[in-house]
Amino acid sequence: MADQLIRAVAANGGIRVVGAVTTRLVEDARTRHRLSYVATAALGRTLTAGALLVSNMKRADSRINLQIKGNGPLDGILVDARLDGSVRGYVGNPSVELPLNPQGKLDVGTAVGPRSEERRVGKECRSRW
């Protein structure tokens, strides 16, 4: 199945929903960057977030940059997404491996470290957490 971005509108435009299937995008990133499992999960989530966020922009040349910095062993994530559907990104340490968390899942939170995010739209920073 090809990657898809699906939009829906309900309640006379009062409700908008956007969903994405990005399996191929994430698999391509995994093979190109030789990512570990936890790095694949972290970058894949951020690539998908970039695609979802940029899909709500209006101008044809719109783009969004997501930079996630933490003090974890992953050493940060950077994603660039454009309205034309192109999405790219990388992680600072693609080979990081961690044991599963107590719930038996990939420990993406520990890999990234404490939260410090920045969202940039074009060249101007619109918001910061």
List the predicted regions and their residue ranges:
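Conserved small/polar residues in nucleotide/adenosyl-binding loops
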Residues: 118-125
